[in-house]
Swiss-Prot record:
CDD domains: hPOT1_OB1_like, hPOT1_OB2, Pot1C. One of its GO terms (molecular function) is telomerase inhibitor activity. GO terms for biological process: regulation of telomere maintenance via telomerase; telomere capping; telomere maintenance via telomerase. Belongs to the telombin family. Component of the telomerase ribonucleoprotein (RNP) complex that is essential for the replication of chromosome termini. Is a component of the double-stranded telomeric DNA-binding TRF1 complex that is involved in the regulation of telomere length by cis-inhibition of telomerase. Also acts as a single-stranded telomeric DNA-binding protein and thus may act as a downstream effector of the TRF1 complex and may transduce information about telomere maintenance and/or length to the telomere terminus. Binds to at least two telomeric single-stranded 5'-TTAGGG-3' repeats (G-strand). The keyword Cell cycle does not apply. The lineage of its organism: Eukaryota, Metazoa, Chordata, Craniata, Vertebrata. The keyword DNA-binding applies. InterPro entries: NA-bd_OB-fold, POT1, POT1_C_insert, POT1PC, Telomer_end-bd_POT1/Cdc13. It is found in: Nucleus; Chromosome, Telomere. Keywords: Chromosome, DNA-binding, Nucleus, Telomere. This is Protection of telomeres protein 1. It comes from Gallus gallus. Homodimer or homooligomer. Component of the telomerase ribonucleoprotein complex. Binds single-stranded telomeric DNA as a monomer. Found in a complex with TERF1, TINF2 and TNKS1. Interacts with TNKS1. Pfam families: POT1 (PF02765), POT1_C_insert (PF21375), POT1PC (PF16686).
Length: 778
């Protein structure tokens, strides 16, 4: 039977393996050697879903770990046919896997996954045999697990990390950003670790599932990461997620129970590792200062940033860019607090409880990227809100005292974010015990000495004419910084000297250009010039002119690239030459390949960009290939054409690309390519003129933005019909055609004024900055 399941009795397989088989070490698995009568044994640490190949054959891949080798201690095993189907039903992480009759082949993914340079190929047709020693049903980490089944992992100290490796490690959290939604669909968390070597490692972790990221609650927590890929950047080692990434997190307090917070349902944790956690705790207590700026509401002061552990008792939508959280921690703020006016129908939470706690709760206004998570929170849950800002605001009315506002600003700087704490968290258990002892009687009957009540508890919008009222009106744009600045009316802006910066609130009366594709320009940051984006006909004209020159055969198939030439049937036998850049004298997969093309049309080049990493149009000269005129793109990648500035560029020899090809893992980033070729790259930018009004004045402000305002890359808008439609819908929302001025949405913007000299005249211009369209506008 090709696949056999063996029971483990007293740490050994119930059935003995055939006597002619001898165990092979991982380090001896090489192509060209005879592995007949040999078997390899390892622990299953990762398995992939069963799939079918193009011909319908079942395919199953697993990763085995061998603890006899310390540096690269894992290898891929590829199974085909019925053997793949059978193993996919039986195998679980932690099983002992024994394979004989395997074929050893080079692994094309070794550089990417950091595993063995070879992989094992297994199938029933080739006479392979598999023995699986299944582990008992999965138990919690604290229960006994057979030592013969539990894999023994090797952990790398932070001062021994090497570029390109995939490692397991332990570390103490020195800084972290709570998970947030990245520009794509994944969640992202940033963690900076340190260990006894005093070396720091910053890890950027991505996952589509929030629960699969480390459950870190505060600085000083201890983490165990499995399968972190190490990359060197600017001389510093950095960690990123790789396939099979998993984590455990522990409270870093000396003497606290060693209870892991796991990112996966199945994991191993042995006594030896408990000792590692305790050693890290003791070292951190003596050598690190990792306590965060935690505070209770009774300790807050104006103009401070702090972390708050609290319970959520109410929440409400405020406008397109902010969300209200009503929280308490059982203590009383010593200052009057701002109560955000919201409509009763918008407020979620127990009305009776909210009324009882009205003098103990504070209103935290959450902005921008934190809004989505805030909306999903359940009332009654326990939170840790990181980097809350307390701001003192003066009342407009003499009968009302100044008050404190609580803000969680947008962005993730300084670890801003919201963490949801489980009920068994020690800090939550302590808070719950404290809240149960809080006497509400005094709070209920006391006149609001410490709280600024703008109307009744569940009143509608206040009638006060103040910025607090105006902020409730839907704003179609979001401020990405400087939220502390107060609004300035346009009349004051227009009557003030330049240069200055302002926060304004206005409506978009009109904008130019009306044809939105005309707003995309090319900008040189060095000489600060703008130019139009060349159209396809202009580029084709340049390419056709170069195609008239025959390729130079002496420049084909050099040491660092391989060339292919063919002749077209049309265009009088036009010759096309493609030069494939090699890496370590080998051709790469298409998705990793840079190629250069001579004699191709724009249509042909676009076809190549769909399959290959990037394409550079070139032409032959006597002794070298060279770039085309910079009126044409010097590089095409995906749907984007990259241009260079004619004025600021000093084109260098195309041979300089070979220096990038010699890198361990060439990234072929456009900025790197431009640098070695002596090109000053032009950047795609939106340039528009907005006419803004607020009832006190009319102001023309220019939008000069690469991608932040529309949250659309200017580089992609011309080739992506979906993004074009999104931009058009956005502008129709900001300035709906045919609508009265009173019906237009408000825009909150930052603008800066600057002087421009025109001969003897000095004119003041205005530019929008640090502003973006609200997420729910389109």
């Amino acid at each position: 039977m090709p696949v056999q399941v063996l029971k483990i009795i007293k740490g050994k397989p119930e059935t003995q393996l055939p006597s002619h088989l001898q165990r092979e070490d991982l380090k001896h698995l090489q192509t060209g050697l005879d592995h007949t009568n040999k078997y390899f044994q390892g622990i299953v640490i990762l398995s992939y879903p069963l799939t079918k190949l193009g011909d319908g054959t079942d395919f199953f891949k697993i990763v085995l770990q061998d603890d006899t080798c310390s540096r690269i201690n894992s290898i891929n095993v590829l199974m085909y046919g019925k053997m793949a189907e059978d193993c996919a039903k039986l195998i679980r992480n932690g099983d002992t896997f024994i394979v004989a009759g395997f074929k050893v082949a080079e692994s094309p993914t070794a550089r990417e996954d950091g595993r063995h340079a070879c992989h094992l190929q297994v199938s029933e047709e080739s006479g392979s045999a598999i023995f699986i020693c299944t582990q008992p049903s999965i138990t919690p980490f604290s229960e006994a697990t057979s030592p013969s089944v539990a894999p023994k992992y090797v952990y790398t100290p932070l001062n021994c990390l090497k570029d390109g490796t995939v490692v397991n490690l332990y570390g103490i959290v020195k800084f972290f950003k709570p998970p947030y939604i990245s520009k794509g669909t994944d969640y992202c968390s940033v963690v900076t670790l340190v260990d006894q070597s005093n070396v720091k490692l910053t890890c950027t972790l991505f996952n589509g599932n929030l629960d699969s990221l480390p459950k870190i609650y505060k600085n000083g927590d201890i983490v165990r990461f499995h399968r972190v890929k190490i990359r060197e950047y600017n001389g510093q080692m950095q960690g990123i997620t790789s396939a099979g990434f998993a984590s455990l997190t522990f409270d870093g307090t000396v003497g606290a129970p060693v209870v892991p917070r796991a990112s996966s349902k199945v994991y191993t944790f042995v006594d030896e590792e408990q000792k590692t956690v305790e050693e890290l705790r003791i070292w951190a207590a003596s050598n690190l200062s990792v306590s965060g700026p935690e505070a209770k509401l009774s300790d807050v002061k104006p103009m401070m940033f702090f972390d708050l552990t609290c319970q959520l008792v109410g929440k409400a939508k405020v406008d397109g860019s902010s969300f209200l959280l009503k929280v308490w921690d059982g203590t009383k703020c010593p200052y009057p607090t701002w109560k955000v006016p919201v409509e009763a129908k918008e407020l979620e939470g127990d009305r009776v409880l909210l009324h009882h706690l009205r003098n103990l709760t504070v209103d935290v206004l959450v902005y921008d990227n934190h809004v989505q998570l805030a909306k999903s929170l359940k009332t009654g849950s326990f939170l840790r809100i990181y980097s809350i800002h307390t701001k003192q605001a003066s009342a407009k009315n003499e009968d009302m005292s100044s008050h404190i506002e609580f803000h969680l600003h947008g962005g993730t700087c300084y670890g801003r974010g919201i963490g949801i704490l489980p009920e068994n968290n020690p800090d939550v258990e302590e808070l719950k015990s404290f809240l149960e002892c809080v006497e509400l009687t005094d709070s209920q009957n006391m006149e609001s000495v410490s709280s600024l009540e703008l109307g009744d508890t569940f009143d509608s919008y206040t009638d006060l004419e103040s910025p607090l009222q105006r902020c409730q009106q839907l704003s179609a744009t979001v401020l990405t910084d400087h939220q502390d600045m107060s609004n300035t009316v346009l009349k004051t802006v227009l009557n003030s000297s330049a240069p200055q910066q302002y926060r304004i609130r206005a409506k978009l009366r009109s904008f130019k250009p009306q044809k939105l594709y005309q707003s995309v320009k090319l900008h040189c940051s060095k000489c600060n010039t703008l130019q139009e984006v060349p159209n396809g006909d202009a580029i084709d004209f340049i390419l056709q002119g170069c195609a008239a020159t025959a390729p130079n055969p002496e420049l084909q198939s050099m040491s660092w690239y391989e060339s292919v030439v063919w002749t077209t049937e049309e265009d009088q036998g036009r010759k096309i030459t493609i030069h494939f850049v090699k890496h370590y004298e080998m051709l790469q997969r298409p998705e990793n390949t840079l190629l250069m093309i001579e004699g191709g049309t724009l249509k042909e080049i676009w076809k190549l960009t769909r399959r290959f990493k990037c394409v550079i149009p070139v032409k032959s000269k006597e002794d070298d290939l060279e770039l085309l005129d910079l009126s044409a793109p010097f590089l095409l990648q995906g749907n984007i054409k990259y241009y260079g500035c004619k004025k600021c560029s000093t084109p260098k020899s195309i041979k300089n690309l070979s220096s990038l090809a010699e890198k361990r893992e060439p990234s072929w980033e456009p900025t790197e390519i431009a640098q070695v070729l002596g090109i000053e790259p032009l950047q795609y930018v939106f340039v528009m003129k907005f006419t803004l009004v607020d009832g006190t004045g009319v102001l023309n402000a220019y939008l000069f933005d690469y991608e932040k305002f529309f949250q659309i890359p200017a580089s992609e808008i011309l080739t992506n019909s979906f993004l074009q439609q999104k931009m058009e819908m956005t502008m129709n929302t900001l300035s709906p055609p045919g609508r009265k001025l009173d019906d237009l949405p408000w825009l909150e913007c930052f603008i800066k004024s600057y002087n421009v000299a025109d001969g003897m005249k000095h004119q003041v211009y205005y530019q929008i900055f640090d502003t973006t369209v609200a997420e729910d506008v389109v």
